[in-house]
């Protein structure tokens, strides 16, 4: 859904390409930090893995906020805090409350999703991530009374089913293995909670871009993608740092200091990870500002599918019949939406000519 005064298809394509490139390099570093040992423990001889996810999130949020500030200054020569200082008080207060809410939902969503992996298998986790469009539309409808046209609901359903089919047919035997610990219901509740938090985050971000003052005498400062990136990450940085200092000081802060002392390379990897993630977020917030969260989520949930199609084209790999069926549903849905929008755009022109 292109917003009024939003970006062109060229802008969207450039942002999606930038998003995919950032995710690719970012995920390689994420795997390096999370799954590869940095050495052997001198006491036990066992591999030493870095296990302080909150510290990674803190550093990531700090750098993303700084990059968002630079992005604001370069793109509009303005201060992100102007949405608080240059708007009438009710609007500024609503911005502040919304930032508090989405910084908390953003901070809680991923840990809750990862926590669910203790009780449900990885396939269930992947399928939940494939369905991200549904909770966003649900929260939009229930909380903000957003009404979606039938074609958009059909497109969301087509993309979701297509990604699910693609994920199921691509998943390895290992990922389908039952790792249930008898608390599947708890794991599913955590997964659903994570999805709803994502839905609340994305739908609230969409609403923030529409927020305007009611007084005609006051000049209203609109939220931009750069402002949102800077301020949201600053809130996440403060929330996560406070939580780590109060509740996880030994297991996160002290542990990281000791680990970096023994393995300095981990800090370089974390900094690279944070900087690349921050660059990727620039594309995320451009899409949010100029289009909407549904376009963004469609781009992210189809990323793996696009990368596999590229591997087919470039390296001669093969997809099975079910995978091609999933691809057909996804691109059929996206193509149908494009056709509907083209016909809607042509209709006013035809009436004018008559």
Swiss-Prot record:
It comes from the Eukaryota. Disulfide bonds: none annotated. InterPro entries: SCL35B1-4/HUT1. It holds the Pfam family UAA. Keywords: Endoplasmic reticulum, Glycoprotein, Membrane, Sugar transport, Transmembrane, Transmembrane helix, Transport. One of its GO terms (cellular component) is endoplasmic reticulum membrane. The keyword Amino-acid biosynthesis does not apply. The chain crosses the membrane at residues 6-26, 54-74, 95-112, 123-143, 148-168, 227-247, 268-288, 295-317, 321-340. Glycans are attached at residue 202. Belongs to the nucleotide-sugar transporter family. SLC35B subfamily. May be involved in specific transport of UDP-Gal from the cytosol to the Golgi lumen. Involved in the maintenance of optimal conditions for the folding of secretory pathway proteins in the endoplasmic reticulum. This is UDP-galactose transporter homolog 1. The lineage of its organism: Eukaryota, Fungi, Dikarya, Ascomycota, Saccharomycotina.
């Amino acid at each position: 859904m292109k917003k009024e005064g939003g970006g062109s298809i060229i802008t969207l394509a450039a942002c999606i390409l930038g998003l995919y490139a950032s995710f690719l390099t970012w995920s390689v570093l994420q795997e390096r930090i999370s799954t590869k040992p940095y050495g052997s423990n001198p006491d036990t001889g066992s591999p030493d893995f870095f296990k302080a996810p909150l510290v990674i999130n803190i550093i990531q949020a700090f750098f993303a906020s700084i990059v968002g500030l630079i992005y604001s200054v370069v793109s509009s020569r303005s201060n992100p805090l102007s949405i608080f200082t240059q708007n009438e008080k009710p609007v500024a207060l609503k911005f502040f409350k919304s930032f508090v809410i989405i910084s908390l939902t953003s901070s809680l969503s991923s840990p809750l999703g990862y926590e669910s992996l203790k009780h449900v298998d990885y396939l269930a986790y992947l399928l939940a991530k494939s369905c991200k469009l549904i909770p966003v539309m649900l929260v939009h409808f229930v909380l903000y009374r957003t009404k979606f046209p039938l074609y958009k609901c059909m497109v969301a359903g087509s993309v979701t089913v297509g990604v699910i089919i693609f994920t199921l047919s691509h998943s390895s035997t290992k990922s389908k293995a039952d790792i249930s610990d008898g608390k599947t219901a708890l794991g599913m509740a955590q997964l659903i909670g994570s999805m709803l938090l994502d839905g609340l985050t994305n739908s609230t971000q969409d609403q923030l871009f529409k927020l305007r003052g009611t007084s005609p005498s006051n000049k209203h400062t609109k939220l931009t993608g750069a402002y949102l990136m800077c301020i949201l990450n600053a809130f996440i940085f403060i929330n996560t740092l406070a939580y780590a200092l109060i509740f996880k000081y030994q297991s996160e802060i002290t542990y990281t200091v000791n680990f970096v002392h023994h393995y300095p390379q981990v800090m370089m990897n974390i900094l690279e990870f944070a900087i690349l993630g921050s660059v990727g977020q620039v594309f995320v917030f451009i899409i949010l500002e100029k289009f909407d969260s549904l376009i963004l989520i469609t781009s992210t949930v189809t990323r793996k599918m696009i990368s596999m199609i590229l591997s087919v084209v470039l390296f001669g790999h093969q997809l099975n019949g079910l995978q091609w069926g999933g691809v057909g549903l996804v691109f059929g849905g996206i193509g149908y939406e494009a056709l509907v929008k083209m016909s809607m755009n042509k209709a006013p022109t035809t009436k004018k000519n008559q």
